């Protein structure tokens, strides 16, 4: 076989026959860099320093000089007291090694963090005395190598936030009355007061200071020290400024300052000094106002200024230049000429990615630490004034509680710190690459309009246009494109190949969205000659605003780096994406993240070449850190002897529970004595095979209807998949119980449980905890626990007997941990923590027991399956394999799909995948080169493949239609020499029940199917009696509360329409909230009597009480006009309940744990 190209450019990945034609000059960058690099910058660790050094050598200009923590400590230093006699400053933060490992933290519910120390210097300016001390600043949560944080034992991810960049923005809107375009402008800082300018329909230029009332802009200019003559000299040619000056009542600077003060602080006596200080504090005080470097950069760029990038406050020049730009825009000018260049005058598009930036993890945590330090600063100031100057040391001034609290608050409660989605490795990877416009300082779901959510041309290569949730968050949450990176200002850049004089070079340049607008960019699949020139004189290229047209080859400045540049990782794993409708591709991207890891992972026959990188970067496989030889392999450990003589032992995790209850299990794939290279996969994780992402299974699929059982997206499945555990998965649930200190004494974990038979306790050990390996079903005891009961008042006789015969055994009740409803499985692990053993437990807890129960779930009807093209469905019927339609050689198909699901949904990719899957399974060989497609395949080395080959068809650069239809006639025969599928990809199928052939040939092939996390076992639910709501006494709702089924308004209408009066009455009373009726009916059923008349529903009594609380006199009258008394309890109910052994005095359980 000709050496087929390897799709995964990484030589360590498995071989795939690739249909790609385009050579990519750049590898996909590390997919977790968005998280890890940002956090490295925050800490300023060695990795970050090395990266900065490398960038400096490469000549990059936008590199940050300081780490995130250095920036804040420098910002806050020095903290001076009110008189300026003492100051406290901070420098040189450092971290000690973490106290506990990641594993210990997960195990013991702790936070994975390292102690942070800072050198604090206290200076007494009067005496010149300096006291220096290293101060502990609290434990700082650390990021794991996988880009996650471990907070209180659970893995969390901090999502990057998309926000509007600080800077100056010009906008325009049409005035309805005068049909004039009205221009406005906002200067938005990173923190501080906004400054807004606007021109109204009478050409009056107004300014709003800090969102207050509008004033003439000339008042602000005069307050800054300008005279009327200076204003006229600079802006005299513009009608708008002259009109504004006429309406301006103020005379000079003092007058203008007082006028501003009156508008901002109405009711306070205006003085010149107060007004000056107010304006100073709003815009010119670095403590109160900060544009941040990015804001300064944007203002300089927009207004053509050359102010130093470290200037964080506004300057007079900024305000003048902004007014200048605004009046020029209003006057209809198109260009602004400055000494160092010409700048366009135009309004801004706020949805453009040049105006939206990312706040990554580092910056989000930095802002939180800044908040904590600002709170600490107040404490330090107060302590400086109250403590004795001689006795002051940095340690006595500093209170670290606000800093620690604000960091903890961020990780625990912020909208952007999220419980990690760990269903499978792709879900975790995508979660870490997520971009959210929600969160503090961002948008809110309700306010976000259509424009913000829509795809924008500037998203190209930066944010995926496909992957976003369905529902209320659509367009507000996105995913970073595969090649994108974030620069030091927080803008997303995407790489392009430089084109010089019509020749493509291998130089790669990263461009931000606003730089890209200036260039003409060709697409990645433009035909190219071997010498790097364009094959055609006219090239299809993009210009500003996403418009594309045919341009001369010499006009092109850059070229896309790869066809998959515009999509995210999950979307790049959909083969034949180019043949799918975008709505279905969106569902396909999202559903890959919901695939549960199966018992045996199987990589797709038809992939895209992205599988290897996605799996290795997600961090759930084990990679060799150095090249060497494998010395020792067991299920739990792999030891590698590196070439430099060092040994490294890798821990292999077995059957762990993920956040979503799926199974995290790693398996070694290397053998003793095997040579391994650096970066090679040593052990597979969940949903990976040989280091490739393997989320589902390759199944033999037929597109045909089957007795209507696959109507409306339902799926018919073969029993083989159940018997052979092909779609079985393991799910692990964690059950926890703690023994607390109560007012009546401590709770106890024990085997001695009152009123429980010995066989129920058979699987418990002597401590009362279930043994590992026990099979349990719902209701079984996992951990025996008793709680002291309140002593009742004793009668004198009892007291006498107690005094004679000594203390009776104290009363306890059974509060054991039982398996919840509908759950079962095998106990695979038990963890016991106790205060006596020295474990750290929450206050009031003496002992904590965790039990892990695993269950193997076979595929069953009601489970949800999906392909990668948004083709999802629910299993309606599982047929015995002998009844499934079968091929001519007797092979029954695995899955029967409805062909009507394809044309309307326009996801034809699934059909292409199915045909190519058949080809990959059986192999092919192309003879001759008498056709264009044959020559193309020969050029890329894909003209032959043995049976069971894996193929790669990259996004937008994959196998073409003519190649697939051509290859279907070149497929290799099977062992019997038969070719079962004709050149159209269709096979003759026979009905498994009768053996008769179906009338028409049917499309048959191999497709990749995922089992989604929506499993019927988690959804099915039934209740006989259970908890009731406290007030209305109606059953609770939902499976989690063990609730009932709501019989709603529309269902009532249905019964009313049938006139089913008695059924309706029962539903409204005894089946719901007629308390007395419930008990009486139970009694009647037990005694075999007729069902008595229903009583009055409790919610009716609640309604009356509610009306009475509004001071309305409400009475209930009987038919004969007598007032009915609503008594709360009836004696015979209590009597009946007592006879039936129902304890009405006990508290009803209010949650499923207690049921």
From Swiss-Prot:
InterPro entries, alphabetized: DNA-dir_RNA_pol_bsu_ext_1_sf, DNA-dir_RNA_pol_bsu_external_1, DNA-dir_RNA_pol_su2, DNA-dir_RNAP_su2_dom, DNA-dir_RNAP_su2_hyb_sf, RNA_pol_bsu_bac, RNA_pol_bsu_CS, RNA_pol_bsu_protrusion
Catalytic activity: RNA(n) + a ribonucleoside 5'-triphosphate = RNA(n+1) + diphosphate
Keyword match DNA-binding: no
GO cellular component, one term: DNA-directed RNA polymerase complex
GO molecular function: DNA binding; DNA-directed RNA polymerase activity; ribonucleoside binding
Keywords, comma-separated and alphabetical: DNA-directed RNA polymerase, Nucleotidyltransferase, Transcription, Transferase
SUPFAM superfamilies: beta and beta-prime subunits of DNA dependent RNA-polymerase
PROSITE patterns assigned: RNA_POL_BETA
EC number: 2.7.7.6
Family: Belongs to the RNA polymerase beta chain family.
Oligomer status and interactors: The RNAP catalytic core consists of 2 alpha, 1 beta, 1 beta' and 1 omega subunit. When a sigma factor is associated with the core the holoenzyme is formed, which can initiate transcription.
Known function: DNA-dependent RNA polymerase catalyzes the transcription of DNA into RNA using the four ribonucleoside triphosphates as substrates.
HAMAP family reported for this sequence: RNApol_bact_RpoB
Name recorded for this polypeptide: DNA-directed RNA polymerase subunit beta
Organism the protein comes from: Thermobifida fusca (strain YX)
């Amino acid at each position: 076989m000709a050496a087929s190209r390897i799709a995964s450019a990484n030589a360590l990945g498995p071989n795939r026959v690739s249909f790609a034609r385009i050579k990519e000059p750049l590898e996909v960058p590390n997919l977790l860099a968005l998280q890890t690099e940002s956090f490295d910058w925050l800490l300023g660790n060695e990795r970050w320093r090395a990266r900065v050094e490398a960038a400096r050598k490469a000549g990059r200009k936008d590199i940050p000089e300081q780490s995130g923590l250095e920036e804040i400590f420098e910002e806050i230093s020095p903290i001076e007291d009110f008189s300026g006699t003492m100051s406290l400053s901070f420098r040189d933060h450092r971290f000690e090694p973490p106290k506990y490992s990641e594993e210990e933290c997960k195990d013991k519910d702790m936070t994975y963090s390292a102690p942070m120390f800072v050198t604090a210097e206290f200076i007494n300016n009067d005496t010149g005395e300096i006291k220096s001390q290293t101060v502990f600043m609290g434990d700082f949560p650390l990021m794991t190598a996988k880009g996650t944080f471990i907070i209180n034992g659970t893995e969390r991810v901090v999502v990057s936030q998309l926000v509007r960049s600080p800077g100056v923005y010009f906008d325009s809107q049409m005035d309805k009355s005068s049909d004039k375009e009205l221009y406005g402008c906002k200067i938005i800082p990173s923190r501080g007061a906004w400054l807004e300018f606007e021109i109204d329909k009478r050409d009056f230029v107004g300014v709003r200071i800090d969102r207050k009332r509008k004033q003439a802009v000339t008042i602000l200019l005069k307050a800054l020290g300008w005279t009327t003559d200076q204003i006229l000299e600079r802006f005299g040619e513009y009608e708008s400024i002259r009109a504004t000056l006429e309406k301006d009542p103020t005379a000079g600077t003092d007058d203008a300052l007082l006028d501003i003060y009156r508008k901002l602080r109405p009711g306070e006596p205006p003085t010149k000094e107060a007004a000056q200080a107010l304006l100073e504090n709003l815009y010119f005080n670095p403590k109160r106002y900060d544009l941040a470097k990015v804001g300064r950069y944007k203002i300089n760029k927009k207004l053509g200024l050359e102010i130093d990038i470290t200037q964080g406050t506004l300057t007079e020049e900024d305000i003048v230049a902004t007014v200048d730009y605004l009046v020029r825009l209003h006057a209809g000018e198109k260009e602004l000429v400055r000494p160092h260049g010409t700048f366009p005058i135009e309004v801004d598009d706020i949805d453009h990615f040049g105006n939206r930036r990312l706040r990554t993890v580092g910056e989000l945590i930095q802002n939180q630490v800044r908040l904590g330090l600002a709170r600490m600063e107040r404490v330090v100031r107060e302590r400086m004034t109250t403590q004795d100057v001689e006795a002051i040391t940095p340690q006595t001034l500093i209170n670290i509680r606000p800093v620690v609290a604000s960091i903890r608050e961020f990780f625990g409660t912020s909208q952007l710190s999220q419980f990690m989605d760990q269903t499978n490795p792709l879900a975790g990877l995508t979660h870490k690459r997520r971009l959210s416009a929600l969160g503090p300082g961002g948008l809110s779901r309700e306010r976000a309009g259509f424009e913000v959510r829509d795809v924008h041309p500037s998203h190209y290569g930066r944010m995926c246009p496909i992957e976003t949730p369905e529902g209320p968050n659509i367009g507000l949450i996105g995913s970073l494109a595969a090649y994108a990176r974030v620069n030091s200002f927080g803008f997303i850049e995407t790489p392009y190949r430089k084109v010089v004089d019509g020749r493509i070079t291998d130089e790669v340049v990263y461009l931000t969205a606003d730089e890209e607008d200036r260039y003409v960019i060709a697409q990645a699949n433009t035909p190219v000659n071997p010498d790097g020139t364009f094959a055609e004189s006219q090239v299809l290229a993009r210009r500003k605003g996403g418009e594309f047209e045919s341009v001369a080859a010499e006009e092109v400045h850059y070229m896309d780096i790869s066809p998959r540049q515009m999509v995210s990782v999950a979307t790049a794993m959909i083969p034949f994406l180019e043949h799918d409708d975008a709505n279905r591709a969106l569902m396909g991207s999202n559903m890959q993240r919901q695939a549960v890891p199966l018992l045996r992972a199987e990589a797709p026959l038809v992939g895209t070449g992205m599988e290897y990188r996605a799996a290795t970067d997600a961090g759930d496989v084990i990679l060799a850190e150095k090249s060497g030889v494998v010395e020792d392999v067991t299920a739990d450990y792999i030891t590698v002897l590196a070439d430099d003589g060092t040994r490294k032992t890798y821990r292999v995790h077995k059957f762990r529970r993920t956040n979503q209850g799926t199974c995290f299990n790693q398996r070694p794939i290397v053998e003793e004595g095997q040579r391994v290279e650096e970066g090679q996969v040593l052990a597979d994780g969940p949903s990976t095979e040989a280091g490739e992402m393997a989320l589902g299974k390759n199944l033999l699929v037929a597109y045909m209807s089957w007795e209507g059982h696959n109507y409306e997206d339902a799926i018919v499945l073969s029993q083989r998949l159940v018997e052979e555990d092909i779609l079985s998965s393991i799910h692990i649930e964690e059950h926890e119980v703690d023994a607390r200190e109560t007012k009546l004494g401590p709770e106890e974990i024990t085997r001695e449980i009152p009123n429980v038979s010995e066989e129920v306790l058979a699987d418990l050990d002597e401590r009362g905890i279930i043994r590992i390996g026990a099979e349990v079903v719902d209701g079984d005891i996992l951990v025996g626990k008793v709680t002291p009961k309140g002593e009742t008042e004793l009668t004198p006789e009892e007291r006498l007997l107690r005094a004679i015969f000594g203390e009776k055994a104290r009363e306890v009740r059974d509060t054991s941990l039982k398996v919840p409803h509908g759950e079962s499985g095998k106990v695979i692990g038990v963890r016991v923590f106790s205060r006596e053993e020295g474990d750290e437990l929450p206050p009031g807890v003496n002992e904590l027991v965790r039990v892990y129960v695993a269950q193997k779930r076979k595929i069953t009807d009601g489970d949800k399956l999906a392909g990668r093209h948004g083709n999802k469905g629910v299993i309606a019927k599982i047929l015995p394999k002998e009844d499934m339609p079968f091929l001519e050689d007797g092979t029954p198909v695995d899955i029967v799909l409805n062909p009507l699901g394809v044309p309307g949904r326009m996801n034809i990719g699934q059909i292409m995948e199915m045909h190519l899957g058949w080809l990959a399974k059986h192999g092919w060989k192309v003879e001759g080169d008498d056709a264009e497609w044959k020559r193309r395949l020969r050029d890329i080395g894909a003209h032959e493949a043995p049976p069971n080959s894996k193929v790669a068809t990259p996004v937008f650069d994959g196998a073409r239609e003519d190649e697939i239809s051509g290859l279907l006639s070149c497929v290799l025969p099977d062992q019997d020499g038969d070719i079962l599928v004709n050149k159209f990809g269709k096979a003759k199928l026979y009905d498994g029940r009768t053996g008769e052939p179906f009338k028409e040939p049917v499309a048959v092939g191999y497709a990749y199917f995922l089992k989604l996390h929506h499993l019927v076992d988690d959804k099915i639910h039934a209740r006989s009696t259970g908890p009731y709501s406290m007030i209305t006494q109606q059953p609770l709702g939902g499976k989690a509360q063990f609730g009932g089924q709501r019989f709603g308004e529309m269902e009532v209408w249905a019964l009313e329409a049938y006139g089913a009066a008695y059924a309706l009455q029962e539903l409204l009373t005894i089946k719901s909230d007629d308390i007395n009726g419930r008990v009486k009916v139970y009694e009647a059923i037990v005694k075999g009597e007729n069902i008595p008349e229903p009583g009055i529903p409790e919610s009716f009594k609640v309604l009356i009480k509610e009306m009475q609380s509004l001071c309305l006199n409400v009475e209930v009258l009987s038919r004969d006009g007598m007032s009915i008394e609503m008594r709360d309890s009836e004696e015979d109910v209590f009597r009946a309940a007592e006879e039936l052994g129902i304890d009405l005095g006990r508290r009803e359980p209010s949650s499923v744990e207690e049921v």
